[in-house]
């Protein structure tokens, strides 16, 4: 299984966790090391500083995932086309680089107007801009109604999970009841959301405070049973990444 081999290959690597943002994401510069080398998951236990948690905030967020031939070239092209995004009511938020493939890029932008965002996603000029930046293959584009769960602490090593659920409200109740269990197993809640067109399609973002414990818990029978009880249908689709840039 891909996930099992990923876990076995990553779980023993030494640790470097960088402090990242809260729900509103503090502004940082691009991670220059990650721009030139592949990203690896690090096994560590991290105890971040714990400021007072903020109240949950909400936003509409477009998430785009695609592979690039060269991250530096793509990043320059992405920055070059910022005015095109702004004109469509899209605002830079987070850029992530995949683990173990650091050329598998995730872009999250905040959305002012969903109609404009949908039109932007279908605009031929976007396709041309992506081709210029070295995007390989078709991008995966989704728009979520997102709730940021600012816990006052986070690391830049994260996992984004896509799932299908029977009922959003029932799933959300079950998810909230498992907060302490996740915390005890090296995971911190970052955000949850559902597709603007179908609230049975959801996303969950967690950050790792202990990568070995967190990875083990995500693959555990306990997690599988909790997901089943919460009404998750089928297998989750997980994207492991580190935050390369925030805005």
Model segments located where?
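C-terminal motif of bacterial Sec signal peptides marking the signal peptidase cleavage site
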Residues: 17-20
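Short S/T/G/P-rich N-terminal loop/turn motif that feeds into the first structured element of a domain
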Residues: 22-226, 230-247
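Bacterial N-terminal signal peptides that target proteins for export
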Residues: 1-10
